[in-house]
Amino acid sequence: MERQGMSEGNPLLAKISTLLTMFKLMYPDMNDLQEDILSKYLIELYEKFNINERTNVGKLKKTDFPIMRDLYDFLAEKKEKGEEEFTKISDFHTILYAYSEGLFAKILNGHTNVDITNPLCDFDILELQHKPKLQRVVYFLLLSHIQYEVVNGDKSESQLYIDEAHIIADPKVPLAMEYLYTAMKMLRSFNCGITPASQSIKDFLSARDDQRNYGEAVINQATQRFYLPMADTEVDFLEREMNMQFSEEEKTAITVVEGRKEEEAGKGLYFVGSKKIRLQVVLTDVEKQLWFDRKPFSEVII
C-alpha cells in the first residue's frame, strides 16, 4: 500500500484510487456506496500513519506506509466500535483476511521489496496461473507499480512488455483494463513504449462498461499491431467485435491449421497504421537455444 500515486496532482488520492481498483478485483461485487465508505476509511488509515494530502511522500521510507494487515486491523476496530458504516463493507473485510493474514498474505501483506534499478527486469507470476483471482490482483499491482516508477523517473527511454495482458481483463471490473488503456496513453509522454500481448482475444475484449470496450480501446490506440495465427472462431470473433475485415488471403495467414502449429509459429499479419503486411519472425540460433531447447544462459553456444 505504498507510494504509487502520480507525480502530478494529489498523490494520496491517486494512490487511494488505485487501491480501490485493486480491492474491486478482490471483491468484484463492491458497489458505489461501499467504495465511498472504503475510500473514507483509507484516508483515515493513512492519517493514522501521519500521511495526508500535504505529506511529501518522496521523503518517506517504505516502512512508513500501512500494509494489508494494518487495513484489516483498522476495519476490525470499526467493527468492534459497532460503526454502522462498517456493516456495509463487512463482506469485504471478510475477504480481506485471505490477503492480510490468510492464504495470500505472504504475497501481498508486506512492504514493497522490488528493486528495478537493473536495466532489464522480469516479473514472473507463472506460479499464480492456477489462482486466477490472486493472479489478476498481482498483475494489476505490478502494472501500477511500474507506471509509478516510469512517471516519477528521469524520462530516459524505456520499454514495457505486458505479456498475457488478458489476465487483467475482468468483465466485472473494467476499471482494471481501463487502467492499462490510460497507462498506454500516459507513459508515451514519459518516453516509454508499451507492448501488450495476449493469446486470448476473447478474454482481452471482455472488459467493457457503458462507455466503451477497453480491450478494444487498447488495440485501437496501438501504432503497430501483430496478429499471430489463431482459431478460425477467434478470427470471426475479432472481425465481429473490432469491426475488422480480413481478405481470404489474410484470414489464411492468421488462421491455425490443425497439425501445422509449429510450421506456422511466428507467422502473421503486421499492421502499421492503415498498412498491413504478412510477416514471419525468425529466431536466431541463440534465441532457439533459449526458447526451444530451454538451455540455461550459461550453456548457450554463441
Language-model features: locations:
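Conserved ATP-driven motor cores of ASCE-family P-loop NTPases powering translocation/secretion/packaging/pilus
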Residues: 1-30, 172-282
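Short, surface-exposed polybasic-aromatic patches that bind anionic ligands, especially phosphate groups
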Residues: 281-292
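P-loop NTPase motor domains
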Residues: 1-192, 260-263, 270-272
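Extended active-site and interfacial segments that coordinate phosphate-rich ligands
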Residues: 295-297
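Acidic, low-complexity intrinsically disordered tails
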Residues: 299-302
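Short, solvent-exposed amphipathic alpha-helical segments in soluble enzyme
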Residues: 138-141, 242-244, 286
